[in-house]
């Protein structure tokens, strides 16, 4: 596959600015090194990315040219999946920050994976839950009692009625969207008055990124934009959300997963993971601040 055939120039995906700054990080991806996990979640970091520029208006770092929506639909639909255990760890972490809304009736998750967070939503009292997931490999690993709540395919706002959702959650997915602003604007229409959007994203300005530079796992060929607190606030407030709150979180995963993210040679990580997989040490959970942000915003209760 020639990936260059599926790339197109774009304006800033957050503010729409046509202003062009110089390339911040030149593309360094080698198509020959991409495999079936290239568009999978929680994979071994490849440390490859597209041309990245910073918007001089809203400060988001974004890829241009970037993959077309048609290519992304195909790529994510056929992506492999091998992070079932980590998904449950992440879901429990994110469940602790579920926003308070007037009602806990209807919740929607975009990019639900194996549906782990849908289970947490049920525990939190939401009566009706729905997850949208393009990867059949991911959704096929869902627990039987939750699989019926997962819709296959890419998220399309038109599939849901306006003002029908109390909470829309979207975790580690905003970076992958060709048009993240469209998702936020659509969410505002789908939410009931007083409803909330709940996002988890990487933080381009985090201490981890400053320390590791382009060896940080957030530099990835599937990440079409990298947010910071300022660009996230700009995005949500300009889309009409109120009471926007952004905070740094601590992720909790088994020790073996943290080593998968470490800036070590891939061969060394594979060997280390095999060793840890055969011991109890690898299963020890550890909470770390690796530069992820939890973001919440509310639709006006008067709308």
Language-model features and meaning:
Residues 1-171, 180-184, 248-249, 282, ...:
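Conserved N-terminal segment of class I S-adenosyl-L-methionine
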Residues 1-6, 214-216, 253-300:
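Membrane-proximal basic amphipathic "stem/tether" segments
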Residues 25-32, 74, 244-269:
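Conserved catalytic loop of SAM-dependent methyltransferase domains
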Residues 26-36, 199-225, 230-236, 259:
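Short, glycine-/aromatic-enriched active-site segment of Class I SAM-dependent methyltransferases
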Residues 129, 197-199:
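Hydrophobic/aromatic residues located in beta-strands of well-ordered beta-sheets
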Residues 171-178, 222:
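Short catalytic micro-motifs in class I SAM-dependent methyltransferases
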Residues 181-196:
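A short glycine-rich, Lys/Arg-flanked "PGG" loop and its adjoining helix->strand segment in the class I
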């Amino acid at each position: 596959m020639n990936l260059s055939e599926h790339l197109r120039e774009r304006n800033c995906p957050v503010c729409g600015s046509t202003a062009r700054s110089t390339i911040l990080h030149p593309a360094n991806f080698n198509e020959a090194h991409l495999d079936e996990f290239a568009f999978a979640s929680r994979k071994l970091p490849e440390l490859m990315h597209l041309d990245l520029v910073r918007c001089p208006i809203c400060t988001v770092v974004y890829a241009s040219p970037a993959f077309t929506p048609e290519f992304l639909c195909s790529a994510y639909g056929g992506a492999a999946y091998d992070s079932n255990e980590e998904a449950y760890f992440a879901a429990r972490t994110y469940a602790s920050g579920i926003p308070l809304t007037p009602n806990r009736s209807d919740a929607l998750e975009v990019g639900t994976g194996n549906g782990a967070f849908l289970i947490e939503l049920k525990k939190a009292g939401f009566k009706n839950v729905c997850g949208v997931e393009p990867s059949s490999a991911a959704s096929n690993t869902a627990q039987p009692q939750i699989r019926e709540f997962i819709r296959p395919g890419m998220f399309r706002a038109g599939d849901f009625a306006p003002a029908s959702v109390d909470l829309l959650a979207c975790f580690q997915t905003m970076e992958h969207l060709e048009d993240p602003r469209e998702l936020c604007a659509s969410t505002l229409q789908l939410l009931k008055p007083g409803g909330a959007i709940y996002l988890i994203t990487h933080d381009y300005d985090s201490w981890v990124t400053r320390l590791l530079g382009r060896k940080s796992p957030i530099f990835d060929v599937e990440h079409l934009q990298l947010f910071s607190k300022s660009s996230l606030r700009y995005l949500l407030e300009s889309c009409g959300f109120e009471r926007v709150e952004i905070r740094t979180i601590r992720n909790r995963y088994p020790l073996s997963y943290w080593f998968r993210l470490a800036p070590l040679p891939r061969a060394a990580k594979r060997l280390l993971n095999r060793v840890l997989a055969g011991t109890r040490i690898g299963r020890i959970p550890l909470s770390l601040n690796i530069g992820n942000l939890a973001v919440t915003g509310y639709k006006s209760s008067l709308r």
